[in-house]
From Swiss-Prot:
Name of encoding gene: rsmH
Tree of life domain: Bacteria
Alphabetical keyword list: Cytoplasm, Methyltransferase, rRNA processing, S-adenosyl-L-methionine, Transferase
UniProt name for this protein: Ribosomal RNA small subunit methyltransferase H
Entry binding sites for S-adenosyl-L-methionine: 35-37, 55, 80, 102, 109
GO biological process: rRNA base methylation
Signal sequence extent: none
InterPro entries xref list: RsmH, SAM-dep_MeTrfase_MraW_recog, SAM-dependent_MTases_sf
Localization per record: Cytoplasm
Top-rank EC class of the record's enzyme: transferase
Lineage, top ranks: Bacteria, Pseudomonadati, Pseudomonadota, Gammaproteobacteria, Alteromonadales
GO molecular function: rRNA (cytosine-N4-)-methyltransferase activity
Species this protein is from: Shewanella sp. (strain W3-18-1)
Length: 313
């Protein structure tokens, strides 16, 4: 594999192990990235197994050529939020034995200054997961209303100074448009008074813009519902989150479908009826990276893995 595609997959053994892979199973890697998880899945699959990988990043699609000679593997260019549509097109609804999602931005995307994801590397202010379509971060910042920017920074970045930062961006962009990551990062650093220890002042705003530009949380919601719809009985969900917004969505989804439908107090309903409304069961507790993994890969520090199984009712 070339250096361009080098990437350390987080919680690799735990995430793939959580799929409980069968020799002849059919699995989905909804976030192919550079193929770390897919490679491990293929190594565990037998000759009759199948892996469907998905990614909306054109560079990831290029990286998937490393598996082009493996008849068990296929890659789909698109967002994982549409995974149920892809599965339906293949006639595999109810036959998927496991879905893996590694949420957020990948290391290659962060490390490539030209992608515009990182405030530590100067490059075009882009931030699109699929840089072949959609508006860039620079285009959005050039026209967004102050209220809209403040809402995005607060909602998706949990930024305390959201309104102040939005006002400053609006005031400065009339003189000089924000076209590069350094332009935005420098402004935020300059206007932020109470800086968090060991955290760049632009961290939360960059996260918020990235999530908004790529509709990341909507994609997660759609992917979870889609996975539930296509999983076979005893099929597994194995999902890595990297910040509280992602993990909260995953945690609540698993909890909601593990508890079953809520019914009004006093409504006559049997235990069997309640059980039949339960669609998932959580497998163990949330898994965090070991100290050893964090030492090898600092970006693993904030990762959380949750595993769930589709119930057979």
């Amino acid at each position: 594999m070339s250096q361009e595609f080098a990437h350390l997959s987080v919680l690799l053994a735990e995430t793939v192990g959580g799929l409980n892979i069968k020799d002849d199973g059919i699995y989905i890697d909804g976030t192919f990235g550079r193929g770390g998880h897919s490679r491990q899945i293929l190594q565990r699959l037998g000759d009759n197994g199948r892996l469907i990988a998905i990614d909306r990043d054109p560079q990831a699609i290029e990286a998937a050529k490393q598996f082009s000679d493996d008849p068990r593997f296929q890659i789909v260019h698109g967002g994982f939020g549409q995974l149920a549509d892809y599965v339906e097109d293949l006639g595999l609804v109810g036959k998927i034995d496991g879905v893996l999602l590694d949420l957020g931005v990948s290391s290659p995307q962060l490390d490539d200054a030209e992608r515009g994801f990182s405030f530590l590397r100067d490059g075009p202010l882009d931030m699109r997961m699929d840089n072949s379509q959609g508006q860039t971060a620079a285009q959005w910042l050039a026209h967004a209303e102050i209220e809209d920017m403040a809402w995005v920074f607060k909602t998706y970045g949990e930024e305390k100074n959201a309104r102040h930062i939005a006002r400053c961006i609006a005031a400065d962009r009339d003189k000089t448009p924000f076209l590069r990551t350094k332009d935005l990062a420098d402004l935020i650093a300059r206007i932020t008074k109470n800086k968090e220890r060991n955290k760049h002042p632009a961290t939360r705003v960059f996260q918020a813009i990235r999530i908004y530009i790529n509709s990341e949380l909507d994609q997660i919601d759609q992917a979870l519902e889609g996975a539930l719809a296509v999983l076979a009985p005893q099929g597994r969900l194995s999902i890595i989150s990297f910040h509280s917004l992602e993990d909260r969505i995953v945690k609540r989804f698993i909890r909601r479908h593990s508890q079953g439908e809520s019914v009004p107090y006093g409504l006559p309903i049997t235990e069997d009826q309640i059980n039949k409304s339960r669609k998932l069961r959580a497998i163990g507790k949330a898994i965090m990276p070991s100290d050893e993994e964090i030492e090898r890969n600092a970006r693993a520090r904030s990762s959380v893995l949750r595993i769930a199984e589709r119930l057979d009712y």
